[in-house]
Regions:
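Long, low-complexity, acidic Ser/Pro- and Gly-enriched intrinsically disordered regions
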Residues: 1-113
Length: 113
């Protein structure tokens, strides 16, 4: 089996894996989003947040593990101060148990820092 060079994305008749991921998120198709994410070879924190948001709505049973993985990546990649870790954890809880729009907006702000 031939490996493709890193950073090169293959394209099918449905487009790139990234395009399929975005369409799956928009259409709220968890399985299609996960398949495309695997094909992409990993997600940015922003894309992983989109998948978490989808899971919070469509598959609550799997959301908590995904949210914990996202939080761990946020900590590992950004090395944020404790106050931002607490804010991120609270915002992730809002996605599932509170006002989703507030949680999403808070997390997007943290990602822009």
């Amino acid at each position: 089996m031939r490996r493709r060079p890193s950073g090169i994305e293959t394209m099918t008749s449905q487009g790139t894996a990234r395009g399929r991921f975005q369409r799956a998120i928009h259409r709220r198709h968890v399985q299609n989003a996960e398949v495309a994410a695997r094909e992409m070879g990993g997600l940015s924190l922003a894309d992983a947040l989109l998948l978490c948001e989808l899971l919070a709505n469509a598959d609550p049973a799997r959301y908590e593990r995904a949210a914990l993985r996202w939080l761990q990546r946020f900590i590992d990649e950004r090395l944020p101060p404790l106050t931002e870790v607490a804010l991120a954890a609270s915002a992730l809880a809002e996605l599932r148990h509170g006002k989703r729009s507030i949680g999403v907006e808070a997390l997007k702000i943290l990602l822009r820092r």
